[in-house]
A protein has these predicted regions:
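Conserved phosphate-binding elements of NTP-dependent enzyme cores
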Residues: 1-644
Length: 644
């Protein structure tokens, strides 16, 4: 291959001084001829001897690399035009397991899309100047936290002409970033997978998207938008809700957070209790009027707490705890930055901090992961930390999170707590069951024998609708009872097995009060505020908070055989003031038994009831990951720089 350069014209600068119009026309004609003959490539030799290569196409003049037309779809991995051709925009290749795509290295876009940069400073134009920092490409940008992305856009460097073009685009981007900042999501990265978002985070993102629509006269319904928010972030969320209201909209919020309730104009309190004891409007009216009234005539428990007639009292004294502690050195993962953390044993320890400050990373990926590995007796190195000691004082670790108590509709509170095993034993011990030779398995809907085989003991039959969601219809053989007719003929105190499973926890506790093996388990469920659940309620219908409390209840009746480290993540989600009080009593009971409870929490009643606090921060995302305060609630309250 040979490069042949043909000289088209030579123009002296002096000609522009003598006859500028003629010189420009001559230059234009020369460029057009050169571009035509060279298929879009032209070289210009300057008076100082330097050469400059220009192209009329999307081709790099230096190495000849071609470039597609730059348009929005180039930066979308959902478009065949922009997706990496090797992995089709997935970022992984499925062989025996999902492996990172070797071409795009998991970035999901074609190489050309990654060569377009934005910068916060002026880039060198001369080709002789070395471009050590070209700025950020789209993958770099979406990998930023929302707060960092906003700072980048505020400092974006554009030429005068480009800035004029980009003004409306930059404004739309910054407005949307502001909306997410205003609802307390500054710590999230823009490329965060939707599947990894908590319910509260997903709800606040939907709320942020509504701020940009400018709707007027709309009704917004929100279900506990403050879930997972630190008290500091509540103010921004409340400000956002008030902004929507000022636009002329109506905001209906289901909420237990005190700050949000006090920001409301009108209060509707439903109760007085849960389940069969609820469903009644106990109090309603303008909030200021209800608070200013001389007496809480409605008897509303909510108003009683809001008027400070009832409150969660401070512990009389903080526990001294037991000898020994779990010491973790060099905890490093995500935004955790080489932190040393000490957890005293035999105490209620509360982990606090603003959203995204590293609390969950520490609890799940450092503390639980390594403790579980130690108790499993596996010889594996410490992960995400330099060292961890103190687990020798404990016998086991239990993570009580908000994951479902079962993966199928067959799981329910009775099966999870073990109460159903004793209930089946009770039915099989009846004279009628013994006369028929029936064992406990006859009263199980999980195995063949006594269950309805038409629906396999589900009570419903799934009808596949192909492109539509699956429809469930009541079984026409057992009419939803889940059992064969003969099985239901056996009763205990006038109730068959189906009728027992339809009882609420509260009803069943009274019904089985003379059977300790069953009553103890039901008492635990009742103590956690779950008296309204039915024994046979499907696990798939329980909220995350309810599932978590079922797990806590299952620990209360467990005999004390070894000291346990309990780890809880925001157990107060979805709880009323009164339920929070009950939860605190239960957690304190676990500690009184010699166990250690570590809980992530934003609820101030739980925080003030703790024996020891570990506060992460000071901010979320890259601005967090440090232990900024530790000690008793009184000691942490004196620490400057701690939002908690």
């Amino acid at each position: 291959r040979h490069d042949i350069d043909a000289v088209v014209d030579s123009i002296y600068v002096s000609e522009f001084d003598r006859s500028p119009d003629a010189a420009r026309e001559r230059l234009s004609e020369a460029l057009e001829l050169a571009l035509k003959e060279s298929d879009g490539l032209v070289k210009i030799k300057h008076a100082d001897g330097s050469m400059e290569t220009l192209s009329s196409k999307f081709i790099c003049p230096e190495d000849g690399a071609s470039f597609p037309e730059v348009e929005p779809r180039l930066f979308s991995f959902n478009s065949p035009y922009g997706a990496c051709p090797n992995c089709n925009g997935l970022g992984t290749k499925s062989l025996f397991s999902d492996e990172v795509c070797p071409v795009c290295e998991g970035k999901r876009l074609r190489p050309e899309a990654l060569r377009v940069y934005l910068s916060t400073k002026e880039l060198p134009r001369a080709r002789s100047e070395k471009k050590t920092d070209l700025g950020v490409n789209i993958v770099d940008f979406v990998g930023m936290s929302i707060s960092d992305a906003k700072a980048f856009m505020n400092n974006l460097h554009l030429s005068e002409m480009k800035e004029e073009i980009a003004v409306p685009i930059v404004r739309e981007i910054t407005n949307r970033l502001d909306f997410m900042l205003n609802v307390g999501l500054d710590y999230l990265t823009l490329n965060r997978s939707a599947a990894t978002l908590s319910g509260g985070e997903a709800q606040r993102i939907r709320l942020a998207s509504q701020l940009g629509t400018g709707l007027v006269g709309a009704l917004y319904v929100l279900d506990e938008p403050t879930i997972g928010l630190h008290q500091r972030d509540n103010e921004r969320l409340i400000s956002t809700l008030l902004t929507l209201k000022e636009l002329g909209n109506t905001i209906l919020v289901v909420e237990h957070d005190e700050d949000t309730i006090f920001a409301a104009d009108y209060l509707l309190d439903i109760g007085p209790g849960a389940g069969v004891h609820g469903g009644t409007v106990v109090a309603s009216g303008w909030l200021d009027d209800l608070l200013a009234a001389d007496k809480n005539e409605s008897g509303s428990t909510t108003l009683s707490y809001l008027r400070e007639e009832t409150r969660v009292e401070l512990p009389e004294k903080r526990r001294e705890g037991e000898k020994g502690s779990i010491k973790i050195k060099g905890a490093t993962l995500h935004n955790l930055k080489n932190q040393n953390v000490e957890i005293p044993l035999g105490k209620l320890v509360c982990i606090t901090g603003v959203s995204g400050s590293g609390k969950s990373t520490f609890l799940y990926d450092v503390l639980h992961k390594n403790a579980a590995m130690r108790f499993s007796r596996r010889q594996a190195p410490i992960e995400n930390a330099a060292s961890m000691t103190g687990t020798e004082y404990l016998g086991r670790v239990v993570l009580i999170d908000q994951s479902p108590i079962g993966r199928t509709p067959r799981s329910n509170p009775a099966t999870y707590t073990g109460a159903f095993t004793h209930i089946r034993d009770l039915f099989s011990a009846s004279s009628e069951a013994r006369a028929r030779g029936w064992k406990p398995g006859r009263f199980s809907f999980n195995v063949a024998g006594g269950r309805c085989e038409a629906c396999q003991g589900n009570g419903v039959i799934a009808v596949e609708m192909h492109f539509l969601p699956t429809v469930y219809v009541t079984c026409d053989v057992c009419n939803g009872t889940r059992y064969m007719k003969e099985t239901l003929e056996v009763t205990y105190r006038g109730k068959n097995i189906y009728e027992v499973l339809k009882m609420t926890v509260e009803e069943a506790e009274e019904f089985f009060k003379d059977i300790p093996s069953i009553n103890d388990r039901l008492e635990s469920l009742n103590a956690t505020g779950l008296q309204y659940l039915t024994l046979g309620q499907s696990a798939t219908t329980l909220s995350g908070g309810e599932a978590q409390r079922v797990k806590i209840a299952s620990e209360l009746y467990r005999p004390i055989t070894m000291k346990t480290l309990y780890l809880l993540d925001e157990p107060t989600v979805g709880l009323h003031y009164e339920d929070v009080r009950k939860l605190i009593e239960i957690v304190q009971e676990l500690v009184r038994r010699g166990n250690t409870v570590v809980v992530i929490e934003h609820n101030l009643d739980v925080i003030k009831s703790a024996d020891h606090i570990i506060d992460f921060g000071p901010e979320g995302g890259t601005g967090g990951g440090k232990v900024i305060a530790k000690g008793t609630p009184e000691e942490v309250a004196e620490v400057e720089g701690s939002y908690t």
